[in-house]
Amino acid sequence: MLNVRDVLRAYLHGYFPMGDPDDGNVYWCRPRRRAVFPLDTYRASRVVRRLVRDNVFDIQINRDFNAVIAHCAKPRRHESETWISDEIVAVYLELHSLGLAHSVECYADGELAGGLYGIALGGAFFGESMFFRQPNASKVAFDALVRQLKLQRFDLLDAQIMNPHLEFLGAVEIDHEEYMRQLAMALEKKISFL
């Protein structure tokens, strides 16, 4: 049974949970190559910069964490299942109630258009998932996350496993040893996400 204590301990040691939609179990992942975002070199795309400049979306933090994780837990287009199991949702809702899990949301005309969620520990933020209901909303939410992390002087933005979308946003892969070095340094910091 997944619980908050085990999840936090896992993050501190470079692991993260992932549900298997085939068997319903939650497994601990610790990939040899880790996707991270270098915060000091991040640059939003022109489209995202324009959307932010024009205030197309109302950006909020932790306004509706429950809705964000519920949207993230839905299967993606062209997929019938998701790695975000009910067990994972329950633990992250508890982490949010403890002030450790956070969401960044984009609203358009009062409706949730996109967002993301993750966990903040020390100077590390572990991005878990993102979704969009309107084009580019998750990218704008991600840009807002990066700006918040820079403002609070975070060192590490962990994206876990590389995929084309993360690479488009600017993620790079580092080996496990480098990841653990960066994680240890980030965890030494006493930083609040907000």
Curated annotation (Swiss-Prot):
InterPro entries reported in the protein's UniProt record: Acyl_CoA_acyltransferase, Leu/Phe-tRNA_Trfase, Leu/Phe-tRNA_Trfase_C
Q: Where in the cell is it found?
A: Cytoplasm
Q: What Enzyme Commission number(s) apply to this enzyme?
A: 2.3.2.6
Query: Mainly localized where?
Result: cytoplasm
Per the record, the domain of life is: Bacteria
Q: Which GO terms describe its cellular component?
A: cytoplasm
Recorded catalytic reaction(s): these are: N-terminal L-lysyl-[protein] + L-leucyl-tRNA(Leu) = N-terminal L-leucyl-L-lysyl-[protein] + tRNA(Leu) + H(+); N-terminal L-arginyl-[protein] + L-leucyl-tRNA(Leu) = N-terminal L-leucyl-L-arginyl-[protein] + tRNA(Leu) + H(+); L-phenylalanyl-tRNA(Phe) + an N-terminal L-alpha-aminoacyl-[protein] = an N-terminal L-phenylalanyl-L-alpha-aminoacyl-[protein] + tRNA(Phe)
Molecular function terms from GO: leucyl-tRNA--protein transferase activity
Q: What does this protein do?
A: Functions in the N-end rule pathway of protein degradation where it conjugates Leu, Phe and, less efficiently, Met from aminoacyl-tRNAs to the N-termini of proteins containing an N-terminal arginine or lysine.
Q: Which family does it belong to?
A: Belongs to the L/F-transferase family.
How is this protein named in the record? Leucyl/phenylalanyl-tRNA--protein transferase
Which species does the entry assign this protein to?
Answer: Prosthecochloris aestuarii (strain DSM 271 / SK 413)
